Regions:
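Amphipathic alpha-helical segments
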Residues: 4, 15, 75-76, 186, ...
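Non-catalytic DNA-recognition/assembly elements of restriction-modification systems
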Residues: 9, 18, 64-94, 222, ...
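Short, solvent-exposed loop/turn positions at domain surfaces
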Residues: 69, 136-137, 209
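Short, ligand-facing micro-motifs at secondary-structure edges
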Residues: 93-95, 117-130, 148-172, 187-192, ...
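Residue-level "contact hotspot" at macromolecular interaction interfaces
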Residues: 142-143
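A short glycine-rich beta-alpha junction/loop motif
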Residues: 153, 168-176, 185-188, 208-228
Length: 311
């Protein structure tokens, strides 16, 4: 069984609105999106975030006339920018502030590099850190609450995970912070969408085709996403995790079976070379006679160090 393909099929059904049934009592995603937009405008007005220079399509215009596929009537097509604040460590912050002199395992705030971001999971970093004081100076690229992280350059381009926010961390180069404007979106749903074949196709389709492929923050903001009602997002995530857990069990079972098969083969060979796999037949020609026929000059040697063989 191709469990990788099975996982992708589950994600494909999920993002098409076919994994769980729709509930007519759910608040439509169009209303949800307006709530999120209002929260975004509040954050901009309070100066907590800045409006991007190249803003995505205005909320006053219809979204995506050429949508990738049809979604249930309670869903809506949108993009990352209308749901998340997207930023990275600015170049001057890295060259001026994050230097060999300021990075040490003895500091308080771990920095998050591309190697800490794997597709679907976060790898905690304990080797490099900056001081709390320096992190406070670079508040924009600090990691203080749950958000998505995406590698935007190099071999792992498009790898996305959820930052668990167990402690304050800080962005290093090559990783984008994708922070929700509101708690009215399930981060796990957004993660699963970006992990799907369609989500990854979108990432690869907009990456710059150079020797070292890369994504700009503007292109990440433009990534399309099919948004279900919030209650349905939760149901989708619960169903995905239930099915993925079953696949994990299948994969573990396959691994255990392969181990058993390998051990069994080894045991069979061990029994065979010790003369214990099949019974000896007294009518068989002794092996010493066979050797004499193969090599007439053969002289048997009684080596006390050799194991005793079957008679």
């Amino acid at each position: 069984m191709d469990t990788k393909a099975l996982r992708q099929k589950i994600l494909d059904l999920a993002i098409h609105g076919k994994l769980v049934p729709q509930d007519p009592n759910d608040e439509p995603a169009s209303v949800l999106l307006e709530r999120i937009k209002a929260e975004k405008e509040r954050l901009i007005k309070e100066g907590k975030i800045k409006r991007s220079k190249k803003s995505a399509k205005s909320s006053d215009t219809p979204h995506y006339e050429n949508v990738p596929f049809e979604v249930p009537s309670s869903w809506v097509w949108t993009n990352i920018e209308e749901l998340f604040f997207v930023t990275k460590l600015a170049g001057f912050e890295y060259t001026d502030c994050l230097t060999k002199d300021t990075i040490s395992s003895n500091n308080e705030v771990p920095i998050v590099r591309a190697q800490n971001v794997r597709m679907g999971y976060f790898v905690e970093n304990t080797n490099e850190a900056i001081s709390e004081a320096l992190s406070q100076q670079l508040e924009r690229s600090a990691l203080t609450k749950k958000c998505l992280l995406m590698t935007f350059i190099g071999a792992g381009i498009g790898d996305t995970c959820i930052f668990p926010a167990l402690k304050r961390c800080h962005l290093a180069p090559n990783v984008a912070k994708i922070e929700p404007y509101s708690n009215k979106i399930d981060l796990k749903y957004a993660l699963y969408y970006l992990m799907s074949d369609l989500g990854q196709l979108g990432v690869r389709g907009i990456s710059k085709s150079t020797a070292q492929p890369s994504l700009s923050m503007a292109t990440i903001r433009s990534l399309e996403i099919a948004l279900p009602p919030l209650a349905e997002q939760h149901r989708i995530v619960a169903e995905i995790e239930k099915l993925f857990e079953l696949i994990d069990q299948i994969e573990q079972g396959k691994a255990d079976l392969q181990t058993i098969i390998k051990q069994t083969k080894s045991k069979i060979l061990d029994l065979a070379i010790h003369g214990k796999l099949v019974p000896q037949d007294p009518n068989d020609e002794p092996a010493i006679e066979l050797l004499k026929r193969i090599n007439p000059d053969f002289t048997p040697c009684d080596n006390g160090h050799s194991r005793k063989l079957p008679q």
